[in-house]
Every structure is written in C-alpha cells, then in structure tokens.
A protein has these predicted regions:
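Bacterial N-terminal signal peptides
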Residues: 7-17
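Short active-site neighborhood of thiol/selenol oxidoreductases, capturing the structured segment around
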Residues: 45-69, 73
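Residue-level structural signal for beta-strand termini and adjacent loop
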Residues: 47-49, 130, 156
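Thiol-/selenol-based redox modules, centered on thioredoxin-like
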Residues: 137-183
Length: 183
C-alpha cells in the first residue's frame, strides 16, 4: 500500500514537472521577449531589436561577486571586439537596479559601457530557464538572431570568464552575425 501511494505521488510529480522540461529553450526557438530596466536608466525590450539587430543576453548570478566581476570587466575592457558586429549585448541578473549591490552600481564600478539589465521579479530569468534553485540566474549566454530566434546558448561561460569579450566576438563571427558598417 505504502509503495503504491509513493508510486502514485511520484507519477503526479513527474506529470506536473513535465511541462517545465518541455519548455527548455533550445537553438531555433523564439527567444522570450523581455522588458527590463537597465543600468543606463533606459528600459529595453527584445522586441525593439527584432528585424534590426542581433542581441546577446549574458545572464550572471549576482553583482559584485568574483566571477561576475571578471566577466563584466572583460566585456567592459574588450567590448570593442564585440562592437565590430551589428549586435546589442547585455549582461542580466535578478539583482535590483538600484542600491549599493544593484546593477547600476556594479556597472559604474567596472566602467561598463553596455547596459546591465535587472530582473528583480525573476520572470524573465524563468522564461529563459536560467533561474536556479537558490533563486539566482545561471551564468548562461543567449545569442539571438535579428529574427528573434536563439542561434546559440553558451552554458559553459565559466570556462572563459576572463576572456568573455573575445569569446563572444569569436562566437558572433562563427554565427555569421553581420559586421557593423563603418562610415
């Protein structure tokens, strides 16, 4: 009897969890739209870029932590390599925008010349499947084409934290993202 009840509960649990598994984003899927505040005072929506420009969305766990600082510094110091491509790139976390541990302060501390997005409600992080069991975003980077489809998902960003900008630029080249036209 006890085994039967446990089996039934497990089956119900799996049935309820199955839709979450089925929704894991993959290459070729439409990237979920977002509307998030940024460190530069603006609000960005993915839909604003559709048909115009590729987007890179680099999720990170928390502002002012070791790995996130290394990644942000790389993108700030070597972002010129990324800017050769017709792309807008963001870092994003579930941190608040304001406050001494917020993304605005984090961007200012590391001289980030690109927007850091804040998702304190965690809704966008959930939509992208990056929210972990501790309530932080996993360090995953999504490459999104001009048409809004996901062209690549990097789930091993830790392997190249200190060269994040170079890696990102190399990946944009591999994905054949157009280079910016120079005047």
């Amino acid at each position: 009897m006890r085994a039967s009840v446990l089996s039934t509960l497990c089956a119900i649990g799996l049935a309820l969890a199955a839709p979450a598994w089925a929704q894991e984003l993959k290459v070729g899927d439409q990237a979920p739209n977002f509307k998030l505040q940024a460190s530069d005072g603006k609000t960005y929506q993915l839909s604003d870029f559709k048909g115009k420009q590729a987007v890179v969305l680099a999720w990170f766990p928390a502002a002012f932590t070791r790995g996130c600082t290394i990644e942000c510094k790389s993108l700030a110091e070597h972002g010129d390599q990324i800017k050769k491509y017709d792309v807008t790139y963001f870092m994003a976390s579930v941190d608040p925008i304001e406050g001494e541990k917020g993304n605005k302060a984090f961007a200012e501390a590391h001289k980030a010349d690109f927007p850091l997005l804040s998702d304190p409600t965690k809704e966008t992080a959930k939509a992208y499947g990056v929210l972990n069991e501790r309530g932080f975003a996993n360090r995953w980077t999504f490459y999104i084409g001009k048409d809004g489809t996901i062209t690549y998902i990097d789930k091993d960003v830790n392997a190249h934290l200190d060269t994040s900008a170079e890696y990102m630029a190399g990946k944009l080249g591999e994905l054949k993202v157009a280079q910016r036209k120079t005047p």
